[in-house]
Amino acid sequence: MHRRRYFYGAAILLFLTSFIGMLIYGYKTFYIEKELAASEEYRYHFALIAEETDNEYWRLIEEGARKEAAKQNVYLEYVAPQRADNDELLKLFDRMIAAKVDGIIVQGIDGRRFVDLVHKATERRIPVVTVDTDVKSSERKAYVGTDNHHAGELAGKSILENTEGEQFVGIVTGRFDAINQQERIAGLKHILEGNPRIQIVGVKESGITEIGATQATYSLLKEYPQITALVGTSALDGIGMVEGLEEIAPDKDVYITAFDLIPETLDAIEEGKIQATIAQFPEEMGKESVTSLLRLQEKDLLENLIYTETGIIDKDNLPALREGQP
């Protein structure tokens, strides 16, 4: 009797186990097929590889890219290192190539590894568009973004046209190893170094963080108390420079030129704490990058340098910008 009960119990348990297993398998199969069906609705799968995950500037590039991708029925995948890290970015680049995406938008990085990865993507017929920072020596199909040398020149012109007498300039830059930062500093020096009343006294790195810019500004002013003008070459440098100045020399009159149109920088211009910022339009960069990749699915571009708008924003033209006027 006990054996019979044991037999029936084991049979029921086996049946239930098999039944539950079938349900799970059926659900997974259905779920995967549903995911595949959803992915097949898109025309293409593009990857946007940013410098840093939650960087406000890169999120604006993503926003512009996503809007255009949605219009064109393209699936856009946004990936980035948690913090700015070239090695991690290159690993993500390699991973996206292995994933066989239809196109890659990526910040250019100086060095052989980046050039080799672009070549690898090209061999696999995956077009690469650099955004924000170009690497002309690579096989990238196009560059979309600011003419960074020209942007640096605009920062220099802002100082020349709005200051008088002898000026001592301190520079806060995002990363010494970033090509776009190097090009901006080169443009700035091109304008300022030929002028006898201007002297660049020092350059410090912010690590593209606000607190880093604050510390860099503090160090510059401590080392060079004669500084009369500060220039930041990455998005969070402006606010950091204001905080650094307020910390070490709150009553000192310093002409501050920032970079990018993040809300905190625009508010500081309105309050008179920052005198000017060099405007980039990251949403436009994102949009044009997706547009370029779409064209590259059919043929190479005739024009592979796609410069987006750049300009000087100050207290005079800020209201027009806020109202959305050109």
Which residues fall in each region the model found?
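Hydrophobic membrane-insertion alpha-helices, especially the h-region
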Residues: 9-25
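Short beta-strand elements in bilobed, periplasmic/extracellular small-molecule ligand-binding domains
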Residues: 69-85, 168-171, 192-211
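Hinge/cleft segment of the Venus flytrap/periplasmic-binding protein
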Residues: 12, 27-28, 284-326
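Extracytoplasmic "Venus flytrap"
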Residues: 44-63, 68, 72, 77-91, ...
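Short, solvent-exposed amphipathic alpha-helices that sit
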Residues: 57-72, 151-155, 179-198, 212, ...
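Flexible loop/hinge segments that line or gate small-molecule binding clefts
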Residues: 113-150, 260-270
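Hydrophobic alpha-helical
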Residues: 106-122, 188, 206-265
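Hydrophobic alpha-helical segments within soluble ligand-binding/sensing domains
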Residues: 144-168, 212-214, 265, 280-298
